């Protein structure tokens, strides 16, 4: 879509309207701008500029209000060409660092770190926050352990690069001993260590074809490769927090709006689709990762046009997870972008320290 080039005056007025609307949640009038901002322009001149912005589709007049509010087009222009993203402030940085520091890097439950990240992100942004753990199919296999639960039942524990762990209970159609399990575990770790789960899943039969160690248990592992070494369900990869903050926003002052929001939060498959889609990259953020923003109906996975989604990836070895903030289009974009960006940096660093 071609971007309309606004004049410097129009850009300044549009930026003021959006910034004022983010704070007040009330339509912004020309009189308010003339009174509170030293633009050197009369009320009438500002009103004419706002009329031009409205004609071009950047702002609109809600009902009979004397003020104007931004449209999706206005928000998009602001994010792409007006917004200035500065570094994270000291209080925000301390809040994130102190919470992630609670988790030692040798702890074997990365889910605690990811849920803590979601809670902190929701608290700072005052929006709904989502952390999606990395896709494990590209994760590097470190080791496998088995726990004998009964003579025909075992627990298989897969340790994947950077503390990610997958646990599955398997029912066997044969009896096994602890000694048999130890021999199979040693063999699997020797043959499979350093491969990705995808590589193991597609080649495990060939890699174990010449082995004569306990064929019964080995064959059961090979037959279960799709279950053992496949991707975790997306519902198990989502950590959601911040619902208590987003419902306090003026946009959710009606019961039906709250019900719609709750339905969306409970539909994790839908949340995953919304978060996992790449939006428009924010050009002002120059990092190793892209921070992207989808506004309203730009995200085809969102049935409502009332939300903005800010997302960025974080990295764990050669795998990638995602962070996201979902909130009303009337959000402090610059603040959310810098917080999401810093949180992704810290998560990537936290997990890389393990390797």
From Swiss-Prot:
NAD listed as a keyword: no
Pfam families (alphabetical): HrcA, HrcA_DNA-bdg
Gene Ontology terms: biological process: negative regulation of DNA-templated transcription
Recorded superkingdom: Bacteria
Family annotation (SUPFAM superfamilies): GAF domain-like (SSF55781), Winged helix' DNA-binding domain (SSF46785)
Described purpose of this protein according to its UniProt entry: Negative regulator of class I heat shock genes (grpE-dnaK-dnaJ and groELS operons). Prevents heat-shock induction of these operons.
Protein family according to the UniProt entry: Belongs to the HrcA family.
Organism: Prosthecochloris aestuarii (strain DSM 271 / SK 413)
Protein name (database record): Heat-inducible transcription repressor HrcA
PANTHER family documented for this protein: HEAT-INDUCIBLE TRANSCRIPTION REPRESSOR HRCA
Keywords: Repressor, Stress response, Transcription, Transcription regulation
GO molecular function: DNA binding
InterPro entries: GAF-like_dom_sf (IPR029016), HrcA (IPR002571), HrcA_C (IPR021153), WH-like_DNA-bd_sf (IPR036388), WH_DNA-bd_sf (IPR036390), WHTH_HrcA_DNA-bd (IPR005104), WHTH_transcript_rep_HrcA_IDD (IPR023120)
